[in-house]
Amino acid sequence: RTGRCEASLSGHTDSVESVCWGGVGFIYSASRDRTIKVWGAEDDTDRGEGRTVGKLVRTLSGHGHRVNALALSCEYVCRTGPFEHSGAHFASAEEAQQAALVRYNKTGGGTEAEVERLVSGSDDFTLFLWSPTTQKQPISRMAGHQQLVNDIAFSPDGRFIASASFDKKVKLWDGRTGTFIATLTGHVSAVYKVAWSMDSRLLVSASKDSTIKLWDVSDPKTAKHTLPGHADEVYALDWSPNGAQVASGSKDRTIKIWRN
């Protein structure tokens, strides 16, 4: 609460484009120097792990151009809950707890899902999938976009990755292996942003073409809805915690709220 700087992390040789807190005591950074760096975010020296705040743990290399974006799979752990997309209410706390447990088990809870996975997107048109706390080599190199990658997002359940690109496309990938799943086409200009619904069923994308598109990942061939309304490029998107609404922000200086 003092506002003091706790640590200054130096090591990148060009500007830092993205930072991401991990869930197991690390912080990740992406840079124009084409690397991702893994830093200690907790002081574990008293436990004999040799990790201190700000200490460089490892450098992840492989991209051929600047790294624009990072996304971390462990985010879903904070969001797992008794969500019901139909809007139905649970009769009791016990029923809600059981629904949450079912959703958690579907993610592979208690097994490999506990290992953080990091995905990076670059100006070299590729994405890399990493296990950043355990190895320097990527799990997968994900190629397919024809222009630079603007944004990436893990689905809350960790099963999917969505990527947005200047090539006007959104692509879906397997969140554990990096295997390509589908290309979502429909935007007529660069796609800037993607965001998942809390139950991982739906995806929204925002574009330079001034529209937002809503996709159902079970049938991604065509957009479920196109949401016109902004008068200029759409830069920002987010779902409400209850999954019922989407907020968007545009170059037209407005924020719009859409109901699912």
Where are each of the predicted segments found?
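Short coil turn/linker residues within repeat-based beta-strand modules
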Residues: 2-4, 13, 43-45, 52-54, ...
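WD40-repeat beta-propellers
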Residues: 1, 19, 36-41, 49, ...
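Conserved strand-to-loop turn within each blade of WD40 beta-propeller repeats
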Residues: 29-33, 121-124, 156, 163-167, ...
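Structural hallmark of WD40 beta-propellers
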Residues: 5-7, 25-28, 57-58, 77-81, ...
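WD40/WD-repeat beta-propeller blade N-cap
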Residues: 10-16, 53, 60-67, 142-149, ...
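Loop/turn segments within WD40 beta-propeller blades
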Residues: 13, 19-25, 71-77, 106-115, ...
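A conserved positional marker within WD40/Gbeta-like beta-propeller blades
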Residues: 26, 35-37, 64, 126-128, ...
